[in-house]
Amino acid sequence: TVIDVKCTSPKQCLPPCKAQFGIRAGAKCMNGKCKCYPH
């Protein structure tokens, strides 16, 4: 799931992804936007 959060590294995406999808969510930075992987 791509969320509207700008990023330069996956670390920046973990907090918003965890907030939205739960503590075990994974995150990647793709094309300057965060992509979350709910588990």
UniProtKB/Swiss-Prot annotation:
Disulfide bonds join 7-29, 13-34, 17-36. InterPro entries: Scorpion_toxin-like_sf, Scorpion_toxinS_K_inh. The record marks 28 as: Basic residue of the functional dyad. It comes from the Eukaryota. Pfam families: Toxin_2 (PF00451). One of its GO terms (molecular function) is potassium channel regulator activity. It is found in: Secreted. Keywords: Disulfide bond, Ion channel impairing toxin, Neurotoxin, Potassium channel impairing toxin, Secreted, Toxin, Voltage-gated potassium channel impairing toxin. Its main location: secreted. Expressed by the venom gland. Potent selective inhibitor of Kv1.1/KCNA1, Kv1.2/KCNA2, Kv1.3/KCNA3 voltage-gated potassium channels. Weak inhibitor of Kv1.6/KCNA6 potassium channel. It also shows a weak interaction with nicotinic acetylcholine receptors (nAChR), suggesting it may weakly inhibit it. Has the structural arrangement of an alpha-helix connected to a beta-sheet by disulfide bonds (CSalpha/beta). Negative results: does not block Kv1.4/KCNA4 and Kv1.5/KCNA5 currents. This is Potassium channel toxin alpha-KTx 2.5.
